[in-house]
Amino acid sequence: MRLHYITVFDPSRSTNENDTFKQLLLFHYFGTTDSIPSLNEKLSIIGVIQGIWSLTSSCVNKDGEDLEKIIELNNDIIFCIKVESRFFISLAISNISDDQSAIPLQYLSAYLWLSYRFFKLLNGSFSGFNKDFRKLTDLLNEFVIPFWNDIYLNLETVTNRSFTVMWPGFYKRANFQHSSYNPGEKNNVEESWDAIILQNILLDKKSYLGLKDILVYHLPKRTKAANRESMGTKTYGLVRNFTSDLNTLPDISNWLYHLHCTYGEISSHILTGNVHFKEELQVEEEQERSRDTNGRDEEESQEQQRREHQETTQNNTSELSLSERVIHNVTLPISFAYDAIHEVSTTTGVSGSLSMIMDYVPKPHWPFISSSNKSADKNNYSNSNDNANSNAPLMAQSEAVGGTIGNSRFGFLISPLNSDLLPSSYQALKLNLNFENSKDKEDFYNCLFWYFDDFLIVIVCDPDFNKICERDYLKDLSFQLCQSMECLNNEILNSQNCDNVESFAYVIRDNVTKEIDSSVPFGSPKFTSDESISTLQLAINGIDQFINDNSNSLSLANWNPITIMGGSNAISKKNTTEGFGNGVNDKTQKFKRKYLNFLNLMSAEKLWDLQVDVLQFLTSLQNSKRDPDYFQEERLLKLNNGVLCYIKENNSNLIIIIKNWFQNNGTSKAAKQRNRFSSDSSKGSSLFQSLGRDVTDWWESREI
């Protein structure tokens, strides 16, 4: 299975046979092709798609805005969706006939919807560009092509979030409920973490009506290292937000989940869309390129020395330090590469935003901060925080990066504290959000991003709220968030010892709130989309390595180096590794509550086979006849290796429970449980009761 091409077109822009080319907004082939398709070939493909769509829709009385179809054409399978009543987005895949481990079509169809929702979140709706379709084409090139090219290079992107990715209009919530967790045992004297945010931030007179909402996410890293602990995925997702009228909550949540699961972490570069996969050069290609450039190395070296000498003689009064000149010399090759990349991207019309590399590289003519001023700023920040909370001393590394509390790291990823030399998206990321109670409902809001270990905070600000540009306000905001997240971290992760492995996993989809509560582990086996694809690496990784390794340099004091969310900066220090590490001794990285179930002990291959089996049952359930006003389907299925799957669907929710029957205490005990609850119909059906007491007790605790 491999991605073949993707196209976006609008048939309404064509009025006759002579201007059919106007309807084509985007057409991109993945990988290498033997010959470049002509415009007529592209138009013929979208013409066939329109014809089949019209034929199959002729008997359907529906507006068509949320329609989707799967079309088989020659050796391709084409996923096609219609959005905003007139725009079509089509994705074609090929080479699936002999692929026994092919990805189910539901995953790719869901990601086609997600790609549209993400584009709308970042750039606005397609219909908003009615007066400037050229700009729409440019934005489609800058977002859609890199988005799907990352999937083409790493096909497991569409499957690594388990069932939660199949429903693009829903979002996953974090669930910290555990058999050992009793909310009544909390100390009521201490202020809760969400009360701190509500009272000290949202309702504070400085922020009132300026901050629209605060979204709190728990995004722990997945780790396969033997010396690192893993945590159940039931805690992954949105912890909570503080408004009930944010209609685009599923979109912003799924966008963050996609970024985190695709690249393995969250950083400033990733949030601003400046990170994508690329193929590492093969050894032969590197050697050939080296031979081609050896003849130019000596001339470039002489020219570089001549320019450096002229610059030094012309700037004798600038008094640049040795470290500053070294930084300048090191970045010269990057500037040469940037010029070439920028020229190619300009002529092809692809990815203008990805050619901003030199904006991220420090230059020697910046207003550098002396070491004394830097120390003074650190002392002032530390003293102000000590006065606010003497029991939690804060050690600030940088006003933009943040600091540490014990073994925890915190700081802003996106905020006005970042250097003005960076693009504006690093100061505030504009997202197209829809608030039900707002006048315009849908508008672009300034969003700041802040992290505390594995917790990511999204601060949604009104476009006219200028308080976020004040340094003191952001410092105070960071301090209040630190207090809140420290309470949350202690409450849900380290409150009680419990490392039990549950004998069941579940997925609950609420059709009213659009929430998904799931404990099914993430992950899938490796899918090779193309044998010609070599090892992958992140395109911005080299710049991140350069920035972080030199974060203590005087020439970078005003640079505010970009950080990565999590307990440790996985790139900057050689002693850190991937996972939950905080750059300290591994012995301290022990979680008292891990939220694991028996599926966490399965291999990726067996877990994937289980997901495919459950997906087949879900498909058969959805294809069955049902009353649109009221229906209820309930099934208990036996899978391989003694695994039971309970599925129940009605108008309000979908419930999937995967039970390891071998870990039950015996069928006799289950029979007793059935007799115990048989007289009380409110406890559930006999099929549900047969899952065992641990499942029924868990369900009763949810209802409480």
Curated annotation (Swiss-Prot):
Keywords, sorted A to Z: Autophagy, Endosome, Membrane, Protein transport, Transport, Vacuole
Region (Disordered): 281-322
GO terms of biological process kind: autophagosome maturation; autophagy; cytoplasm to vacuole targeting by the Cvt pathway; late endosome to vacuole transport via multivesicular body sorting pathway; macroautophagy; protein targeting to vacuolar membrane; protein targeting to vacuole; vacuolar transport
Gene Ontology molecular function: any one: phosphatidylinositol-3-phosphate binding
Topology class, membrane: Peripheral membrane protein
Activity regulation note: The YPT7 guanine nucleotide-exchange factor (GEF) activity of the MON1-CCZ1 complex is autoinhibited by the N-terminal disordered region of MON1.
First-listed, main subcellular location of the protein, grouped into a coarse class: membrane
Keyword Transferase in record: no
Cystine residue pairs: none
Keyword Protein transport annotated: yes
Coiled-coil parts of chain: none
Gene Ontology CC terms, in alphabetical order: cytosol; endosome; intracellular membrane-bounded organelle; late endosome; Mon1-Ccz1 complex; multivesicular body membrane; vacuolar membrane
Domain of life according to the entry: Eukaryota
Subcellular location: Endosome, Multivesicular body membrane; Prevacuolar compartment membrane; Vacuole membrane; Vesicle
Assembly and binders: Forms a complex with MON1. Interacts with YPT7. Interacts with YPT10 with a strong preference for the GTP-associated form; may interact with other small GTPase Rab5 homologs but at much lower levels.
Function according to Swiss-Prot or TrEMBL: In complex with MON1, is required for multiple vacuole delivery pathways including the cytoplasm to vacuole transport (Cvt), autophagy, pexophagy and endocytosis. The MON1-CCZ1 complex acts at the fusion of vesicles with the vacuole, through its regulation of the SNARE complex during the coordinated priming and docking stages of fusion, and particularly at the stage of tethering/docking.
Family in the record: Belongs to the CCZ1 family.
Further remark: Present with 2870 molecules/cell in log phase SD medium.
Protein name: Vacuolar fusion protein CCZ1
